[in-house]
Amino acid sequence: MKKIKIYADGADINEMVKMDNENFVTGFTTNPTLMSRLGITDYLGFAKEVLSKIKNKSISFEVFSDDIDDMYRQALILRDLGDNVWVKIPVTNTKSEPTYDLIHKLSTEGVKVNATALFTHEHIEKVFDALNPNINSIISIFAGRIANVGLDPEPTMKFAAELTKEHPLVETLWASTREIFNIVEAARTN
């Protein structure tokens, strides 16, 4: 069984620094919505400040553009901020345009991608096909939101876990966690 890793999700730098001191926290994720809620308007400045304080754990920063070409440009800027940066790319934009080609391009260029907002087996399969198997990557499956609509997220997470056996550099992230029990469920999916 793989070891469970805990990622703290947020945009409050002081809280992130506190969590950085906790042994159980493996890394961090944030996104434009969380930052907007805290009134953060200088995304690049925020990212640089976080990275100046958190140096030894992975941090996933999400692109904020809805245009796929601009997502690519932003991803390269984020990638260049540090070796511990993963670039979050949503599996589709708000126009429901898939980003699999973008994920493939970035991954092929050596960008550590955190493909996010995955809900379905199709999303998972297409992202796995897009990722460079020689580059560390994360797929963030919104298991909590799957559960919110009354579905059991475990089969979806188990499906992804099976695929990681063939892609050992790809990790699955049980995203949108709602309950402590989700840790038990995640452990059961291996």
Question: Which role fits each region the language model picked out?
Answer:
Residues 2-17, 21-25, 29-109, 143-146:
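Active-site beta->alpha loop and helix N-cap motifs at the rims of alpha/beta catalytic domains
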